[in-house]
């Protein structure tokens, strides 16, 4: 079994190396979050200030909520894609007589090795990276620029454990499928593995939707004296239009998380819908659209990083714009502290996910050449497939931003003024352009590596 694990890792080295890159970056971000939070908390405790301690906890929890969640999603989806892309090999194992239970153990062991190596390298690289990352904290004006960096004793093992956990969780579904699907069916579906939405994904959606529904009613419920005192201490007042606008706009992020939890019901219909609006007269466009739809389960994973990057930018800045339009003293202070690691893992994840299916894309390009397609058509089809992935993620992010703007306008009662102020057009154009450029460039990268 050990021999098969290592031989298969070498045989599919290109795919596993991309996964290792994502796991290393994810581990580095996890290590940076742990070290930065612990360093800020240690310094605040040394100052003996309850305000500084509270600020450290707020920043740390925000990092976990935004950057940590994005890292978890991208790590798990990337490793799931890696396993799904090797479905043909797993089917051949079953043909050779290897039991399904052993195949599942082998796959999870391989993913565990990648998570372990990524966690170790991420923990090591997080130490020099945390000093660079803390430059984004200067906008807080709370902690010193030369904040002492302290990695706790549990930092390295926790980084490794969390990285491995996210990797293994993402691979459990594809590994279970590889062990249970009949080998002939798996061989037929090797280029386009089928996926299904599981019960726990709907549980996540239900929790997120409950938050969306309950938010408008919370401010109308009577509060006790203790609750009023706590809100006054924190500076929050949900009866203030500015606070209501910012709270309403932040609901877009909950909606985005809920939608990304069930990509088969959100991203797949979105991809099918908007690509159907463009006529398929061009052979390059027709081939790119057909490939993206045919590999829908793999395409969903590729779209997720771009969707996260655009949705995070849109919803956060929508909350700030809505608050400022209603008189709240909000700013984007602290956005870089969560935005930089999120954009970093999103970019690396997007590049890796597109590159990992490059072999299948090149095989399809070769088939197009056999039936008479020109080289220019094949290359255009490859680039257009990257465009489809990026545009689908961009449209998802724009939809999340629009949801935030509408929710803020309705919840605050600010109307059109809040709606217009909630849409950060310039930043959305910038992030969308970067996502599009990355996707198009990465579709060419695997061909250059051959």
Model regions and ranges:
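Alpha-helical transmembrane segments, especially those used as permease/efflux helices
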Residues: 2, 6-36, 55, 68-71, ...
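Interfacial "coupling" helices/loops that link adjacent transmembrane helices in transporter permeases
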Residues: 4, 15-17, 73-114, 348-387
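Selective transmembrane-helix segments that form parts of the transport pathway or gating/packing helices
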Residues: 16-20, 71, 107-127, 164, ...
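Small-residue-rich transmembrane alpha-helices
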Residues: 28-39, 79, 112-141, 156-180, ...
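Membrane-anchoring hydrophobic segments
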Residues: 46-190, 194-196
């Amino acid at each position: 079994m050990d021999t098969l694990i290592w031989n298969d890792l070498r045989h599919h080295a290109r795919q596993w190396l991309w996964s290792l890159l994502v796991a290393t970056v994810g581990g580095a971000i996890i290590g940076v979050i742990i070290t930065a939070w612990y360093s800020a908390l240690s310094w605040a405790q040394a100052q003996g200030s309850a305000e500084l301690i509270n600020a450290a906890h707020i920043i740390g929890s925000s990092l976990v909520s935004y950057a940590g969640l994005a890292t978890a999603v991208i790590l798990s989806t990337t490793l799931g894609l890696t396993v799904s892309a090797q479905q043909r090999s797993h089917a051949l194992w079953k043909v050779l007589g290897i039991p399904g239970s052993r195949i599942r153990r082998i796959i999870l062991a391989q993913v565990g090795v990648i998570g372990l190596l990524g966690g170790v390298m991420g923990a090591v690289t997080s130490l020099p990276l945390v000093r660079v990352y803390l430059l984004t904290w200067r906008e807080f004006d709370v902690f010193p620029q030369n904040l002492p960096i302290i990695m706790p004793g549990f930092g390295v093992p926790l980084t490794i454990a969390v990285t491995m956990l996210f990797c293994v969780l993402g691979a459990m579904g594809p590994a279970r499928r590889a062990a249970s699907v009949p080998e002939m069916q798996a061989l037929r579906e090797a280029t386009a593995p089928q996926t299904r939405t599981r019960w726990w994904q709907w549980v996540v959606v239900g929790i997120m939707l409950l938050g969306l529904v309950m938010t408008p009613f919370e401010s109308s419920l009577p509060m006790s004296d203790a609750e009023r005192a706590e809100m006054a201490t924190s500076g929050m007042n949900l009866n203030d239009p500015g606070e209501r606008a910012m709270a309403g706009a932040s609901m877009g992020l909950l909606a985005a998380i809920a939608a990304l939890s069930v990509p088969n019901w959100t991203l797949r219909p979105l991809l099918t819908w908007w690509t159907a609006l463009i006529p398929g007269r061009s052979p390059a466009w027709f081939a790119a659209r057909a490939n993206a739809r045919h590999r829908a389960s793999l395409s969903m994973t590729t779209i997720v990083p771009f969707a996260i990057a655009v949705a995070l930018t849109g919803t956060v800045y929508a909350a700030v714009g809505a608050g400022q339009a209603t008189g709240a003293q909000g700013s984007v202070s602290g956005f870089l502290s969560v935005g930089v690691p999120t954009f970093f893992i999103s970019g690396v994840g997007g590049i890796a996910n597109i590159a990992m299916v490059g072999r299948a894309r090149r095989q399809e390009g070769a088939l197009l050449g056999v039936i008479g397609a020109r080289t220019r058509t094949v290359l255009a089809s490859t680039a257009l497939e990257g465009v489809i992935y990026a545009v689908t993620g961009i449209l998802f992010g724009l939809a999340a931003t629009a949801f935030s703007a509408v929710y803020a306008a309705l919840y605050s009662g600010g109307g059109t003024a809040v709606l217009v102020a909630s849409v950060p057009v310039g930043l959305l154009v910038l992030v969308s352009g970067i996502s599009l450029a990355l996707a198009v460039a990465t579709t060419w990268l695997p061909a250059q590596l051959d």
